[in-house]
Amino acid sequence: MLEHELTVTNKLGLHARATAKLVQTMSKFQSNTTLSTKGREVNAKSIMGVMLLAASQGTVIRVRIDGEDEHTAMQALSELFENRFNEDT
């Protein structure tokens, strides 16, 4: 199991388009992935769950990934956050 903290840095936070990219990315992996912040924990493969986090710019999200492809999944998710969901260019 891997745990890591990622910060939402894109201007609009985890809005619908960014959430869809996150869910699509994580759905490619078999590992179970949860995101938590502000006392809420959700499945990273659920659009509604991720939207419920209401994560705005600057929000720190704890990521927990468990499974065979956890390292690859964490790398993909980290890159998505680092690239600001390819929005703030």
From Swiss-Prot:
One Pfam family cited in the UniProt record for this chain: PTS-HPr
CDD domains, sorted: PTS-HPr_like (cd00367)
UniProt entry keywords in alphabetical sequence: Cytoplasm, Phosphoprotein, Phosphotransferase system, Sugar transport, Transport
Residue numbers bearing the Phosphoserine modification: 46
Keyword Phosphoprotein applies: yes
Free-text activity regulation comment from the record: Phosphorylation on Ser-46 inhibits the phosphoryl transfer from enzyme I to HPr.
Domain (HPr): residue spans on this chain: 1-88
Superkingdom of this protein's organism: Bacteria
Biological processes annotated in GO: phosphoenolpyruvate-dependent sugar phosphotransferase system
GO cellular component: cytoplasm
Location(s), subcellular: Cytoplasm
Catalytic site positions: 15 (pros-phosphohistidine intermediate)
Cited InterPro entries: HPr, HPr-like, HPr-like_sf, PTS_HPr_His_P_site, PTS_HPr_Ser_P_site
Job description of the protein: General (non sugar-specific) component of the phosphoenolpyruvate-dependent sugar phosphotransferase system (sugar PTS). This major carbohydrate active-transport system catalyzes the phosphorylation of incoming sugar substrates concomitantly with their translocation across the cell membrane. The phosphoryl group from phosphoenolpyruvate (PEP) is transferred to the phosphoryl carrier protein HPr by enzyme I. Phospho-HPr then transfers it to the PTS EIIA domain.
NCBIfam families: PTS_HPr_family (TIGR01003)
Family to which this protein belongs: Belongs to the HPr family.
Protein name in the entry: Phosphocarrier protein HPr
Organismal lineage: Bacteria, Pseudomonadati, Pseudomonadota, Gammaproteobacteria, Lysobacterales
